[in-house]
């Protein structure tokens, strides 16, 4: 299958120095690298990950400030992330939207800061359980995309990834079927095709794990995964990555 996969680990607020050393000791001796592997640790560990990870692994941040500098306690600017050789940044994750009340307008500002800093954005979008049950999935996603991505942004080669994360399938034990996920990815793909001629990979962020990765990644419009809990186990994360390798090279 001639499709490049992007397998991204979102460690959220987890990890330690010993965890990082053990994690990459395991990956270094076991991983292939024809697809993109991205590790997004807490900011405090970005430098440690960069120093410890095999060279083929890309580093990503979990957030970026919408400001360049100033009295914004706890924030980290795009310039600071770039100084740490960060290559990707997660923007608009459902937990940021929920716990930090980030709006689509906030998310667009953050995406622009990532672009200014030459950091590839991973833009997260997705619907809640209530929105899915009331058949609003496509309306919600349409609004999230159009509120953030305009023609000027889409005219630039910014290395954008879209991560579809159905909120109802994150940390709940619920998972979208591969067909359900692919249908939404197809909608996003069709929508983006009308907005830009560039090909934008769309990855799945709804509790991908080793047991469902093959079925999901074999779907035509799923180009990888943004993986939370399962990425904290180096063996499971590597197995997911290797599934992507087998699909691409098999």
Where are these regions (language model features)?
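Active-site loop-to-helix "anion-binding N-cap" substructures in soluble metabolic enzymes
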Residues: 1-250
């Amino acid at each position: 299958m001639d499709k490049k996969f992007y397998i991204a680990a979102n460690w959220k607020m987890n990890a330690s120095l010993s965890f990082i050393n053990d994690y990459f000791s395991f990956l270094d001796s076991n991983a292939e690298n024809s697809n993109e592997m991205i590790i997004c640790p807490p900011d405090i560990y970005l430098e440690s990950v960069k120093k410890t990870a095999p060279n083929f692994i890309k580093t990503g941040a979990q957030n970026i400030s919408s400001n360049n500098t100033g009295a914004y306690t706890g924030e980290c600017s795009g310039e600071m992330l770039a100084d740490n050789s960060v290559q990707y940044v997660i923007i608009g994750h459902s937990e940021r939207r929920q716990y930090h009340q980030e709006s689509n307008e906030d998310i667009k500002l953050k995406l622009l800061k990532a672009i200014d800093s030459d950091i590839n954005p991973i833009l997260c979008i997705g619907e809640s359980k209530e929105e899915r049950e009331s058949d609003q999935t496509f309306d919600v996603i349409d609004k999230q995309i159009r509120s953030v991505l305009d023609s000027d942004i889409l005219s630039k080669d910014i290395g954008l990834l879209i991560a579809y994360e159905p909120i109802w399938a994150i940390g709940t034990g619920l998972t979208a079927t591969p067909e359900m996920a692919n249908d939404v990815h197809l909608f996003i793909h069709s929508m983006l095709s009308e907005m830009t001629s560039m090909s934008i990979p769309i990855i799945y962020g709804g509790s991908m794990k080793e047991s469902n990765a093959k079925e999901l990644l074999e779907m035509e419009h799923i180009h990888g995964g943004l993986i939370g809990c399962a990425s904290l186990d180096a063996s499971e994360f590597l197995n997911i990555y290797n599934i992507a390798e087998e699909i691409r090279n098999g």
